[in-house]
A protein has these predicted regions:
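Structural signature of WD-repeat beta-propellers
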Residues: 85-86, 125-126, 165-166, 210-211, ...
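Short loop/turn segments that connect beta-strands within beta-propeller blades
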Residues: 94-97, 134-138, 174-178, 220-223, ...
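Blade/loop signatures of beta-propeller domains
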Residues: 30-59, 225
């Protein structure tokens, strides 16, 4: 303690001495230390509360969902919520009461997924595996080593899941045996934002968004490419400018595929032939939400926007929460729910 105090006295004395020779001079690290922090987002705006929010339940679980170095997220199926943590566990909680139904020790570093059906649970690990575990007795039914990290897993469709890996491959896997049914690949981009949108299945086709803004429609049975289209980058001056990942959730509604890319576009595409119906230059790393007539998304500036599904015309925007809003919006009962950075 004496050494520290002595250092401070000498330091302050030195500053005082410097002031005599250089009037008005104060070292930068002194001014910056006492300078009020400037936040990169606006303050919370004033608003009139006209909706009551009631907490139904709260549950404290061991571990945490740490998605800084993974793509962990909760998954809901029926009245169950599957919660992966950084302690290799997956907790199953009642969505009605918050009661902990069971905890499954996977023995692996859960990295991505989680997908579940009535019987099995599927997830990707940091060990580059995809695993199917029986929910009733926690038994591993099958496990396959993939060519790279598992970035996303589709919902189960006709006893098949479709897995996207970090090397831009998509693999169809039989959920009963773990057998690879087919594998198809794209040329990986030289630079990308680490992430991947979840494959979606509709009418015997699988739709996947890749890191170069490319959307590919595959035949779900054979893996053959039916069509592909690319959402162009807004800017192309540098490699960073050309980042154009499709990492957020895509939507299919009435035969139209809606997708959005980072530094690229929001587009409506005919899911049958890949024809672009309309396109807007926007940028978002998050996914889309919808109701009957509109598409909702959050721009990179944290501005919530609503556009017409059929024309692509912007109907409204909410910019009072500039850079505060994060994540994919959720449409529920004529409300749009969005996370705040604080």
């Amino acid at each position: 303690m004496k050494k520290i105090l002595f250092f401070l006295i000498i330091f302050l004395s030195s500053c005082s001495t410097t002031e005599r020779f250089l009037p008005g001079f104060t070292p930068d690290f002194i001014t910056k230390y006492f300078k009020e922090e400037v936040k990169p987002y606006v303050g919370l705006p004033d608003f009139v509360k006209n909706t009551d929010v009631i907490k139904v339940w709260e549950k404290k679980l061991p571990g945490e969902i740490n998605n800084e170095y993974s793509f962990l997220s909760m998954y809901k199926l029926g009245d169950r919520i599957f919660i992966p943590t950084d302690e290799n566990n997956i907790h199953i909680v009642s969505s009605e009461t918050g009661e902990l139904k069971k905890t499954i020790d996977t023995g692996l570093d859960v990295f991505s997924g989680i997908i579940a059906d009535s019987d099995l649970l599927y997830f990707g690990s940091k060990q580059d595996t995809i695993t199917a575990i029986k929910q009733s007795d926690h038994k591993v039914i099958w496990q396959r080593l993939m060519s790279s990290e598992v970035m996303s897993i589709s919902e189960v469709a006709n006893d098949v899941i479709y897995v996207v890996t970090n090397d831009s491959k998509i693999t169809a896997i039989d959920i009963n045996t773990g057998k690879f049914l087919w594998i198809n690949s794209q040329i990986p981009s030289s630079l990308s934002i680490r992430g991947s949108s979840k494959p979606i299945i509709s009418d015997d086709k699988v739709y996947v968004g890749f890191e170069d803004g490319r959307i590919v429609s595959y035949d779900s049975l054979s893996g053959d490419i039916i069509w592909q289209n690319q959402l162009k980058s807004i800017r192309i001056e540098t490699v960073i400018d050309r980042l154009n990942d499709i990492d957020g959730a895509m939507i299919i509604d009435n035969g139209i595929l809606y997708a959005i890319s980072y530094q690229g576009s929001l587009a409506a595409i005919d899911s049958f032939n890949g024809q672009v119906l309309w396109i807007n230059e926007v940028s978002s790393i998050d996914g889309l939400a919808e109701n009957d007539d509109n598409i909702f998304f959050l721009s990179d500036e944290g501005i919530l926007k609503g556009v017409d599904k059929y024309t692509g015309k912007q109907k409204w925007k909410q910019d009072q929460f500039f850079k505060r809003l994060i994540g994919t919006p959720v449409y529920y009962n004529d409300f749009i729910l969005v996370s705040d950075i604080e």
